[in-house]
Amino acid sequence: MVARAAFPKGCLAMRVRDALGPLFDDEIFRSAFGVRGRPGVAPGRLALVSVLQFAENLTDRQAAHAVRARIDWKYLLGLELTDPGFDFTVLTGFRDRLLAHGLEEKILDLLLARLNELELVSGRGRQRTDSTHILAAVRDLNRLEFVGETLRAALEAVAVAAPEWLASWMPGGWQEQYGARVDSYRLPSDESERTQLTWRIAADGYQFLEAAVGVSAPAWLPQVSAVGILRTVWLQQFQRTITDGVQEVAWRGKDELPPSRARITSPYDPDSRNAVKRGSAWDGYKVHITETCDAKETGQPHLITHVVTTDATVGDPVVVDEIHDQLDAKGLLPGEHLMDAGYISAELLLTAPSQRDVRVIGPVRPMTRRTVQATGYDKASFSIDWDARRAICPAGAHSRYWTEGLDNNQRSAIRIRFATETCAPCPSRGQCTNSTRYGRQLTVRPQDQDAVLERVRAEQTTEEWKAVYAIRSGVEGTIHQAVTAAGTRRTRYTGLRKTALAHVLTATAVNLLRLDAWWTGQPLAPTRTSHLAALDLAA
């Protein structure tokens, strides 16, 4: 009665309780809690608080305060007005328990199961997927800052784990050198001084790593996480040679560094990776969001059905099978799945319809640069004789070389090359190849894959295909809502698994926001159009 008096028109929390009832059963989370000790806070309530926390982009302290102070939250949680709530650290412990027992997906799954019962979400419809970058919860560091901060982080960790050993071993001056965080503001500006500082930090790091495995050090010291990170970073960033007892240290060159997928970018988040996409670089992760998009046909709201979180270097095509597997397990596998070109591959176009009865809709990339520029002879200008294993050019010449193997992405590919003496005298050579030493080269997929690529390239030029694919762009609005409402752009936590849990909570929160808008008749926002673009110049 008090909540009704305070919110006569209702609010999100009250409408969720009225429409969905108790969402999260305590029994689902039972394995994450012990059977002895003091009674704890009901895990179902903690799950609901965690979702509301992300729906309103609150900190743990703010969420715990809302449980104590807000009538609408008490209504949703089924608490008495006099309930004192709980300490904010309980939320941290709850997330840790979810991760420790592999229950991080359950919160979104339980909501989807309830919505499935209410026929608000179902499989075999149309869904769409897109990804966005996630910034790690660490500051950006240049190379010198990075190695200095990595050594400082290791010393900080050992100062807590083995203070007596570190105090007895640590050389003089290290407290002043590594006591404060490494920052460009405090680093020397002179290049020669920066170089000397780099070699000093490198030498100090090697000295510490040798001492950590020495006789006087605790046997377990190398197992400290920060010490292991220091060892890995020094291996990745430096190369050391010892000649006649003299140690020489140098940076690893660009070609000597490990690939981005293996290279640590921060001592405080070893799962974070660096990636570059369309000229934009970031350290962190990537999240793939899948949502329903058949509202016009069903009258149902657009709801997120699955999220996948990876490090920043994982390519989009890699996650498609996982998305389909998880959606199938939930009974939410779509009949049509819209994706951008980054996800599309010949293998996917072949296997998704045959193995899962899913029609994947997305553009296939142009075959060659000449296709994009619409000049010269592209691959479509050549005919392929699969039985004779050769290609025939527009002038009627036959290729000489046919090599089967893998492309740079480890996918099956066939490389076809024309002989130099065949192409050299050809009057159309300038329209065919820029090479002055070799004949024209083609790279094609195996016959079945090549056929499906040609079919899709023809389909994507039709107005019908374009109208269906245009629906895909709406998922970018979902990403925008997750970023603005829940602060998804920068992760709150360090580590891949904690970040993935945050994205599950975000997806669940966005679904509640979407449901509330649907219940209250709030229409979808139209595409933004500037006043200038909207002018009718013909008037």
Labelled PLM ranges:
Residues 1-35:
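Basic, low-complexity segments
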Residues 5, 9, 38-41, 278-279:
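Short secondary-structure boundary/capping segments within folded domains
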Residues 31-123:
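Basic, low-complexity intrinsically disordered segments
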Residues 62, 83-84, 92-539:
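Anion-binding and metal-coordination hotspots
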